[in-house]
Amino acid sequence: MSQVPCYTIINSPDLEVPNEMQLKQDLEKGDTNHKIETLKKVIKLLLNGERYPGLIMTIIRFVLPVQDHTIKKLLLIFWEIVPKTSGDGKLLQEMILVCDAYRKDLQHPNEFLRGSTLRFLCKLKEPELLEPLMPAIRACLDHRHSYVRRNAVLAIFTIYKNFDWLVPDGPELIANFLDTQQDMSCKRNAFLMLLHADQERALNYLASCIDQVHSFGDILQLVIVELIYKVCHANPAERSRFIRCIYNLLNSSSNAVRYESAGTLITLSLAPTAIKAAASCYIELIVKESDNNVKLIVLDRLIAMKENENMEKVMQDLVMDVLRVLAAPDIEVRRKALALAMDLVYSRNIGEMVLVLKKEVAKTHNVEHEDTGKYRQLLVRTLHTCSIKFPDVAATVIPVLVEFLSDTNELAAADVLIFIREAIQKFPALSGLIIEHLIEAFPQIKSSKIHRAAVWILGEYVEGPQIIEVIDAIQQTLGDVPMVEAEQRRLSGDPTEEQSQQQGSATGGVSGDGSSSTTTSTSNAINKVTSDGTYATQSAYSLAPVAKVEKRPPLRQYLMDGDFFIGAALSATLTKLALRYVELQPDSSAQNRLTTRVMLIMSSILHLGKSGFPSKPITNDDTDRIFICLRTLSERTPEAVSVFMHYCREALGKMLDAQHDEDQRVLKEKQRATAKVQPDDPVLFAQLSNGRDNQLGENVFESSLNQALAGTKTAQLSDISSPNNKLNKVTQLTGFSDPVYAEAYVNVNQYDIVLDVLIVNQTNDTLQNCTLELATLGDLKLVERPHPVVLAPHDFCNIKANVKVSSTENGIIFGNIVYDTALNTNVVVLNTIHIDIMDYIIPASCTDTEFRQMWQDFEWENKVTVNTSFTDLHEYLRHLLKSTNMKCLTPEKALSGQCGFMAANMYAKSIFGENALANLSIEKPVDDPDSKVTGHIRIRAKSQGMALSLGDKISSSQKQSVQAA
């Protein structure tokens, strides 16, 4: 099968297949157009498995002499796919006539026909046909047209590779051709042949013209780079001979050549100058290339370079160059560039990096783009990481980030507050600066979520004289108190205190002799133009009153919209501030004044929630929280005071410590995963050929070829680690008592499934047209229909079928085997093959904010009830993670201990980019150790299939655990 070329299957409608006699008549008597259509039809039928041995002579007699170019092209395809040998493997006699036709086409005056024929000869696998044509092929090397010459080189290359005895002097012939050739495409093909057939001649040619390499065309330069890489990898002593050539190719006009040259350079040399030159070349490619896919690929190469410790030290000086990539509009490119810069930055250039990021922040205020909000969030997180990693720059970063609090984009503002919360906890010296800017930005915040977080930070960290300042700022954004009376005055049209103050400031200079009303009435007169063009005056007193929509303060507006969660958070903050003020202020009257003021605000919120003015009433939970705050202020019991004064900050400190420990654990695992091979590790034979002392590492050409042949890298490694892995994936399709036995090995690759089906004829009869018919359910698609085979008695064969996968859903493959015997046609129904969703899901991680946002956005939810024999909460969680390939986002410290219940978030991504979220909520009685775990799992995904498939997987894993118990 390895000798059979690969074909492109052209789908044709299921019409009646014409018989051989009809095709012969059309080819004999039809005109040129009719012959073209008939020839196309014959080619499609041959590709679909039909056999017409009697047509060959008809085509030789009536079609081959036609000089039409379209027919010539179709004939090349026909001769490529038609069987050229008889049943005993001997060449058909008719092919001698075809060989003569090939020779005439190779001597045809039309250069396109010559070149097409030469390309066709590259695909022939019959040396008997090629041998008489060798003189004509050699003569084409001297043709005047470059199209003929370059295809002649390819033909000689292919023939030499397959049948070197047909052209024993091939390398010498092509080397002489290369010396006299001027066309770059011809030189490229000739050099490519020498590269694979005779590297010594290729090296001699390169050495003779190494100073002119920069003037060659890009197609030849790419082959030269490949040669240098292979030669230096096989013989590292040659590096010094060709490294200057690679340096010169870094300045090539072709981006492809520069990319390959940079990759080759860092494999040949780890000198700082080489690393810097290659990295700078990569960065220039990213900046100048417009294709985002190219940018991402080159960024991945830079990230791979950074993983090498020696290269990372050199690349640290290129941080500012990496930040030039931020000019790209694509958010993924920016995300990777910022992550790379963050890994490379160090104390010397952190200041410059922060300045660049500040400029990028300023740019986002003036640009409205689809991804502007995400980019702002990205910048905030990067500045956050910079400040935590290098505390010296935190003071300059905080004022820039606080400006984001007034942004309408909640994501960026929420990340700013997360940064502020961590900075104020870790750097107490900056608390004064942070609080000052936070109070200043507090009235401009536009989101209740951001206001809640800001209020919590202010209540937790404000001390001393700033307490009164914070309470004043809160009351200013809350409005008049009591709020119910203020809303009643607003509805009745009476001016509130705010409006009175505004009007008083506006008319403060008016005298009391009645001139104020005169001025007002005069200003209320409106000039109008009548139909005849004259002016008329209309008094404001004659106009109907127009309802004026008045804007409420932000916090008041949240409460009027029914969001009383902000009221509960506000009450907790005011309670903390009042308790802290009581500790600092010895004067009891001042204590009582502030406490009364704070309690009035809380009671006013409660009154407003039950008054009917807001769009939704206050909830019982928020009411209880506010009552607790009021009781704490009135009774001031030590336990309650400690909760408000100390426990909240301690909880934050523990959470940040847990996050830091988790980050360190992940970093150590990553370093352990990328560790070099240890002395006591088993050594694979593939590594023995290179040796561990080889600085050039693995040959990328060989590794990519091996990976392509073995499928995905993960599948290849799993087969090596477990020799029985393939046997575990064998699915029995029929019974042993069936006349035809079938079993299949399901090989799951990244985007397709390969079924290797073994079919055994268990009868004493010959089975004609034994066909494997398959169909699919779910998001699976059969790529091609397997061809029918003939099975002798007790014979067997292997049939492969490809199934394309385009999404993460459970799929089913079913079908039957149809075969003909001497008496009738029989059908054997196959067992169904279930495709496991777990082959396409990989664990992933995200932040809590991203998880909540996706949980809110995804519309499909699947709730699975826990039904298991497990009696331990942690064991069930581990079983769930193992059976779903998901990652637990909840920190280990938050899950430690036995308290009778557990809640955890889990996340995974598919290889198609789909996200899967899961929330586990389980419990069991603490006093009954033998009781089973109960609860439920909620799954959310963007697509219905993903949510249902993951739920089915969880349900099936639970059934297996119950049956095992």
From Swiss-Prot:
Positions with biased composition (Low complexity): 513-523
Membrane topology: Peripheral membrane protein
HEAT repeat positions: 128-165, 237-273, 274-311, 313-350, 392-429
Gene Ontology terms for molecular function: structural molecule activity
Keywords per UniProt: Cytoplasm, Cytoplasmic vesicle, ER-Golgi transport, Golgi apparatus, Membrane, Protein transport, Repeat, Transport
Keyword 4Fe-4S: no
Compartmental location: Cytoplasm; Golgi apparatus membrane; Cytoplasmic vesicle, COPI-coated vesicle membrane
GO CC terms of this entry: COPI vesicle coat; Golgi membrane
Protein name: Coatomer subunit beta
Species name: Drosophila pseudoobscura pseudoobscura (Fruit fly)
Lineage: Eukaryota, Metazoa, Ecdysozoa, Arthropoda, Hexapoda
Gene name of this polypeptide: betaCOP
